[in-house]
């Protein structure tokens, strides 16, 4: 049973955000900064964010050359340029909001490993298309420097992206949660939304935490639940995409700087703390990986380990230390969903595997909608 004090002071809010990942944190942060006296709460069903915000590889990336080429199968060049611009603006907003040191940002560039020689004509095409986004040409041919990398001779080309980098995902989320606490946002972890009911005067949220269920009331609600959004809005074009990440044991003598992609962006790796963090290969078994369930696909894991030993570090003795998975959200195209569902409810979702780049911007946009 609830007390008088709980009923009178702890259940009613001006603005509630569902989902405690990067988008949700920035939605709460943006709204509270714009309305300092508002009562703002953030609900996260896990003790830690459950989606991809703490499960990603920490890449501040905007699309490798072959990935952009693939994207043109599903959208126009103008749409692709616009989306790339949003990704870039998202990283700039993230860095400006929290500071590079607080999020562990490193401007180490991005690199695409090519099994064939670099397509210079393709590179020139995208440099010309994206020059207005970045202020200069983002891509350059670094194939002549391949000998300075530990990769196998199967790699015939190396394309650099001058504006990409990496972040420390743990520091990023930790910084956000601290900032939310400092400005007075109530954060409820381990709290799951079961259902909601909208009326003319409010939105009532039925939630559960542990064995306790109760109703919270809000004037406005932002759903920032990415791949899990169809639980509440099944009509939206959102499919889950599970991503597998492995991290090796420390590797003596490892010197590797940058964020790396291959196979049209599906595979990726980076060095951190003398380890290699690598993931992806979802394209090898998309039907199985179209799931909300966390777990490891043996086929994908075997291929990643093979790539690690034969393609990335063939001259090193490397052992996998541990692994995890995260759930991303995709659709018929890579355009994110930012939508006002009613006067009181808005949705920000479907980040297309680019949550680090898009998350802060989408959080701001969904807060501005309400």
Name these PLM-found stretches.
Residues 314-370:
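C-terminal catalytic lobe of FAD-dependent flavoproteins
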């Amino acid at each position: 049973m609830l007390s008088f004090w709980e009923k009178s002071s702890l259940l009613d809010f001006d603005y509630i955000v569902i989902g405690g990942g990067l988008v949700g944190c920035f939605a709460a942060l943006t709204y509270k900064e714009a309305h300092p006296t508002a009562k703002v709460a953030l609900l996260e069903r896990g003790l830690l964010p459950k989606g991809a915000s703490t499960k990603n590889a920490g890449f501040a990336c905007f699309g490798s050359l072959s990935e952009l080429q693939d994207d043109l199968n599903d959208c126009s060049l103008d749409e692709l340029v616009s989306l790339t611009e949003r990704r870039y603006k998202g990283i700039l907003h993230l860095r400006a909001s929290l500071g590079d040191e607080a999020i562990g940002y490193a401007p180490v560039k991005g690199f695409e490993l090519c099994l064939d020689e670099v397509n210079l004509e393709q590179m020139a095409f995208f440099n010309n298309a994206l020059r207005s986004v970045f202020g200069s040409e983002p891509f350059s041919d670094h194939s002549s420097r391949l000998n300075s990398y530990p990769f196998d001779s199967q790699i015939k080309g190396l394309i650099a992206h001058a504006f990409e980098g990496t972040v420390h995902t743990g520091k990023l989320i930790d910084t956000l949660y601290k900032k939310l606490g400092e400005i007075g946002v109530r954060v409820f972890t381990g709290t799951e939304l079961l259902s909601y009911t909208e009326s003319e005067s409010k939105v009532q949220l039925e939630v559960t935490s542990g064995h306790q269920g109760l109703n919270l009331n809000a004037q406005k609600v932002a759903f920032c639940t990415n791949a899990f959004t169809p639980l509440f809005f099944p009509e939206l074009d959102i499919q889950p995409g599970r991503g597998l990440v492995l991290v090796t044991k420390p590797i003596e003598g490892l010197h590797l700087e940058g964020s790396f992609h291959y196979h049209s962006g599906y595979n990726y790796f980076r060095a951190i703390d003398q380890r290699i963090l690598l993931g992806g290969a979802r394209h090898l078994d998309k039907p199985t990986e179209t799931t909300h369930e966390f777990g490891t696909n043996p086929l994908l894991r075997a291929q990643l380990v093979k790539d690690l030993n034969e393609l990335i570090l063939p001259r090193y003795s490397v052992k996998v230390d541990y692994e995890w998975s995260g759930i991303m959200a995709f659709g018929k195209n890579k355009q994110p969903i930012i939508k006002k569902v009613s006067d009181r409810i808005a949705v920000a979702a479907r980040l297309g595997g680019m949550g680090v780049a898009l998350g802060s911007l989408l959080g701001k946009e969904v807060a501005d909608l309400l």
